[in-house]
Design a protein with these regions (language model features):
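Long, well-ordered amphipathic alpha-helical subdomains in the mid-to-C-terminal portions
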Residues: 63-65, 278, 289-367
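Canonical P-loop GTPase G-domain recognition
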Residues: 237, 243-303
């Protein structure tokens, strides 16, 4: 019998036996994952008053929701976010703001977890704003600090909030300044701001904190190489981390080297000579000394008036930054600019027009359009 005849008989058999298990191809009817009787209830949006009331009461869930609203890029959220910030402002400003940065591998998260638990044990309420790097290629963010700081996240006196940097210079989240206000209004009296690493970016963090702490690891070759002078000049306090085991001697040597280097810098405007400490998050040694150094610095600048002077200067700086950000956003959202900017970009890439002339003409388009809208 030929294969053709076999195929014919198999087809004929299949056509006349529809109920055989071998011929069932679709299986039983798939049941819905969610019951058809279940009605998804839409979450009711909180009013500005409810947000503010919850924040002032120290409600962490509402605080987190408010921060998400402030960080949102949705224009519809902007007005309410600003109302919340404005209502919280009279209750803010009473915390100590500490910026913490360091070279890659300096163990910032480990150090923050160790000293953070210690600070919380001193009856402080601590907020940790861990600013994660956003990828320049994909715009994604690691947001991994909560996994690296497991024990501190379970401390009832500590609030950890990782925020994407949104590609901004230095890894500072676009709305970190407003987040600080909300955390202070919620009753947190110590705020740590962890940055992504050493670079130009740290200038932004320095402009929103009372104390700038620089972490450095020892035993990485020439201790003074790989760290920019500008970052060292901004530091009010330096910590050599991982000073334990066989690394203790290297840490002490690094401490001496950095202390000597810092003496060569001019005395800062605060009148404070930065100090260098060693610590170990593993053995918990040196943490109390570091915190004592923080308290000494804060006492010094409060007595000589630099504390308030610095905050006033920071407020002025952020006023201008807010203006710049608002103008930049208005420019790129303008319909006339959106319609022409691609054309100008192409002409610049083809060397048909200089970048300066392109910018000038795009600004003229923007101003003409805004005047027309008026």
């Amino acid at each position: 019998m030929s294969f053709t005849k076999i195929d014919h008989y198999e087809k004929e058999y299949a056509d006349t036996h529809h109920d055989t298990a071998l011929n069932v191809t679709q299986g039983v009817e798939e049941q819905p994952i969610v019951s058809p009787y279940f009605k998804r209830r839409k979450k009711r949006a909180l009013s500005t008053g409810e947000y503010v009331e919850g924040i002032l009461a120290g409600n962490i869930t509402i605080l987190s929701q408010a921060i998400t609203l402030v960080e949102s890029a949705n224009p519809d959220h902007y007005a309410q976010a600003q109302e919340i910030i404005e209502a919280c402002l009279p209750h803010a400003g009473k915390s100590v703001r500490i910026g913490i940065t360091g070279v890659p591998g300096a163990g910032k998260s480990t150090f923050i977890e160790a000293i953070g638990n210690m600070v919380a044990g001193l009856r402080h309420k601590l907020a940790v704003l861990a600013i994660d790097p956003s990828s320049e290629r994909s715009g994604g963010s690691i947001l991994g600090d909560k996994t690296r700081m497991e024990s501190i996240c379970n401390n009832p006196s500590v609030f950890v909030r990782p925020s994407p940097s949104a590609g901004s210079l230095g890894g500072v989240a676009r709305k970190t300044r407003e987040t600080i206000v909300l955390c202070e209004a919620a009753g947190f009296d110590v705020i740590f701001i962890e940055t992504v690493g050493v670079g130009q970016s740290e200038t932004a963090v320095h402009s929103m904190v009372d104390l700038f702490m620089l972490l450095q690891i020892s035993g990485a070759g020439d201790e003074l190489q790989g760290i920019k002078r500008g970052i060292m000049e901004m530091a009010d306090l330096m910590v050599i981390t991982e000073a334990d085991g066989e690394n203790i001697h290297k840490a002490e040597l690094a401490q001496t080297q950095f202390q000597g280097a810092l003496r060569l810098f001019p005395v800062p405007e605060s009148g404070w000579r930065p100090k260098v400490y060693t610590s170990s998050a593993v053995t918990r040694t040196g943490l109390e000394e570091v915190w004592k150094g923080v308290e000494e610095y804060l006492d010094h600048i409060q007595k000589n008036g630099y504390f308030q002077h610095n905050r006033n200067r920071q407020n002025k700086y952020w006023m201008y930054e807010s203006i710049n950000e608002a103008l930049r956003g208005s420019f790129y959202r303008d319909p006339a600019v959106e319609a022409r900017i691609g054309e100008y970009e192409k002409r610049v890439l083809e060397d048909k027009i200089s970048s300066f002339i392109a910018a000038k003409e795009l600004l003229e388009i923007y101003f003409k359009d805004t005047r027309t809208l008026e």
